[in-house]
Amino acid sequence: MKPNHSVNSIGDPINRVDGVLKVTGQARYAAEHTHAMPQTPLVGFLVASTSAVGEITHLDTSKAEKAEGVQAVLTHTNAGPLKAFSQPDDEGRFTQSRAVLNDSHIRHYGMPVALVLAHTLEQARYAASLVAFNIDAQPAQLLLAPDQATEVPESLDGGFEPDVESGVAPTQSATDINVDMQYTTPSQISAAMEPHATIAHFDGDKLTVYPSVQIVASAVQALATTLEMDEDNIHVKSPFIGGGFGSKLGLHYDAILACIGARYLERPVKVALSRRHVFYNTPHRGHSFQRMQLSCNSQGYLTSIAHHSAMPKAKGYTFAEATGAGARVTYHANYINSTHRVKSADTPLIDSTRSPGDAIGSLAFESAIDELAHKANIDPLTFRLNNMPKVHPVNGSRFTSHKLESCLQRGADIFGWQQKSNAKPGKVIGHGVASAMRMNVLVQSSANVAIDKNGMITVTTDMTDIGTGTYTILAQIAADAFNTSVDNVTVNLGDSQSPASCGSGGSFGAASTGSAVLKACEAVKSSLLSLLPEDYRDAQFLVTDKGLCVRQSNSEKIQETPL
């Protein structure tokens, strides 16, 4: 482990700058910000629907209201004004209304029917069991077979087109080798270590919210939309997040319920979902039906790739997973056809879940590639290497980078692929290879960087750290920019009053916000250089025991820089 006081630490396994806070319990997560509240927060516990879809016809909260410690029971009859769920429909999915307890309609199994507010969790949970309700259940619309998915989504997650067809479908010859495979994957849920939780507090018309959310800026917008408030009156803080994997990209019921409760009682409220609640009140990955049709010639060169995906889409929510995106770029083929079909279903939200699209799409695609290589009697590694694209297989554009070939070759060398023994007939134990492709995504981000005369650097942005090391990454970037160690860098994250970033998600966080931090560092250095004499214009900054210093190019002279 490289000591943190060394310089040029990018890429080195240094100690995480927030590590001590975490291992000593000083890093506060969403449900732990009670110290910042003017009163001890009341605890909210939700009452969950037992039907997948229908209308609430009867609701009796009288017994719950009389239970020990209970301060209020909120339902759609008294929760207060909220903009209808998923409105306005021209907004992005993370900024639309996330309304709950706003009408009698049940959209999915487990949806909150009521919220009990009490002094303790035990009191709230017991009182929740006393709430009586009836639901006029209706048949749920679900995706049970691929041919039921007939809707073409407007777009896919990541901005991909739902359907792509490139080249001309080849005429089959007698020597062509084909596979036509069906793959299914189950629905999946992130179930991060930290369940979704929120503490909310109103001070007059000012709302402060501590949620567990990956993108802070859109959380402010979603709260403003849902609660019909001015964004300037909302302050969101999310300094530490115990895992997200996409399930916390946007706000969910815990945040809205906490805000509704705080508004109703005019005191702080905490709502933390139980592990059971997480499974039907937060986003999940929908199950998939995938058909892979691949063809190659007798030499093992791909002639045709067809990837057809069918998945459910939550009603009132725009997300559709880009399952076939990988098949469009991983290997070269003369003909590529990729389609996506969905069915609007009465389910909890379906949204980005750990490596959306790629995780399940590459599973089907790479499995089919293996099947084709086996049928062609060609080594699966050789088969892949023979089909590396020189340009984008669909649009012909030049890749910024496409490192799959070198990755496979390096992996084969480390693994000793050439020395492997073939599996014996009838045996299922052997060696294999598979590829995974994740497109590089950059999203607009901003950051503020300040440095004082002692060389102490402060980085401020609303970027979040979901356990991926953002605090350390940004500290390393700033430290390297000024030729100092991360010990001289303070990073402030997760506050909506800071410059807006991309947030964490889609594997774009470090690259996008890291670039913003680097640009801000360069701007600071440029401003400082403009104050120096002409012969220092090509100088370098560094931090010594004298504080912030400047060194002339090609010179050993070090001179303190006045700030």
Residue ranges of predicted features:
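Glycine-rich loop/linker segments at domain edges
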Residues: 12, 17-25, 89-92, 160-198, ...
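Short, surface-exposed loop/turn segments at secondary-structure boundaries that line and modulate
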Residues: 74-111, 218, 236-257, 276-291, ...
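Flexible, low-hydrophobicity surface segments
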Residues: 1-157, 181, 254, 326, ...
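Stable alpha-helical structural segments in soluble proteins, enriched in small hydrophobic residues
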Residues: 114-118, 124-128, 226, 256-268, ...
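Extended active-site and interfacial segments that coordinate phosphate-rich ligands
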Residues: 17-21, 44, 129-142, 221, ...
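Helix-loop-helix junctions that connect adjacent transmembrane helices in secondary transporters/permeases
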Residues: 148-227, 387-456, 541
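Structured beta-strand/loop patches that form or line metal/cofactor-binding pockets in enzymes
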Residues: 269-290, 434-437, 444
